[in-house]
């Protein structure tokens, strides 16, 4: 198997490119490169999440889990300038691109870090993620099981997953794990899932959040 985008230090030769993210009132041109997720175009799942997720909170700590070169994180930062946006990934090339893209866009409220970074806060007011499905089901469950419990009591996590890559089974796993999990959007084979605490839940301690994040 060729090296995947969730490698910590991609060995692929550099092939710089760019992707445009165009939304109402917002136009971002983002630098991309080989060795990161979807370098040639804005991933359709990412686009669906951007189009269908509700507006983010104006303040607080917002998380893009598996940020890649930064499209979700930068939109969060632009839409919520009073918030701190945490862009998390294991891929150093992706993090460098996300940081450079944030600087180019003048978005000083983005922090690009690896999953084990000690500056990460203890909780989040929103999670957006196009998660790294290809790490495998067990690793994905471990990843989400470490980060979703860090949501504030009234907060939600929005995950976009292709149907043929397991969106329905992921929704069932979320429900079986004690989350209120519902589908908020579906288009062209992609599903946007919302994960919230059940009403009886109280905040639980997070698991090992140093696992793989794209």
Predicted feature locations:
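N-terminal auxiliary segments of SAM/dcSAM-dependent transferases
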Residues: 1-25, 34-35, 39, 213-214
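General small-molecule cofactor/ligand-binding pocket signal
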Residues: 31, 111-113, 182-184
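Conserved SAM/SAH cofactor-binding pocket of Class I
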Residues: 44-129
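Glycine-rich phosphate-binding "P-loop"
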Residues: 126-139
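A short glycine-rich, Lys/Arg-flanked "PGG" loop and its adjoining helix->strand segment in the class I
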Residues: 141-153
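Conserved beta-strand signature within the Rossmann-like core of class I S-adenosyl-L-methionine
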Residues: 154-161
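Conserved class I S-adenosyl-L-methionine
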Residues: 162-179
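Core SAM-dependent methyltransferase catalytic element
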Residues: 186-214
């Amino acid at each position: 198997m060729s090296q995947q985008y969730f490698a910590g230090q991609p060995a692929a030769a550099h092939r710089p490119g760019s992707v445009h993210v165009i939304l109402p009132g917002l136009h971002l041109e983002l630098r991309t490169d080989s060795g990161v997720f979807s370098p040639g175009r804005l991933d359709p799942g990412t686009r669906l999440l951007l189009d269908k997720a509700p507006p983010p909170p104006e303040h607080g700590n917002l998380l893009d889990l598996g940020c890649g070169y930064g499209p979700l994180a930068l939109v969060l930062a632009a839409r919520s300038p009073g918030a701190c946006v945490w862009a998390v990934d294991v891929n150093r090339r992706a993090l460098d691109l996300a940081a450079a893209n944030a600087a180019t866009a003048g978005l000083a409220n983005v922090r690009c870090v690896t999953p084990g970074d000690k500056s990460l806060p203890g909780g989040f007011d929103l999670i957006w993620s196009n998660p790294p499905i290809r790490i495998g089901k067990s690793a994905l469950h471990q990843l989400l099981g470490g980060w979703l419990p860090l949501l504030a009591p009234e907060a939600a996590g929005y995950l976009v997953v292709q149907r043929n890559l397991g969106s329905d089974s992921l929704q069932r796993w979320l429900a079986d794990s004690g989350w209120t999990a519902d589908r908020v959007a579906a288009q062209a084979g992609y599903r946007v899932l919302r994960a919230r605490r059940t009403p009886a839940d109280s905040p639980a301690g997070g698991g090992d959040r140093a696992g793989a994040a794209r």
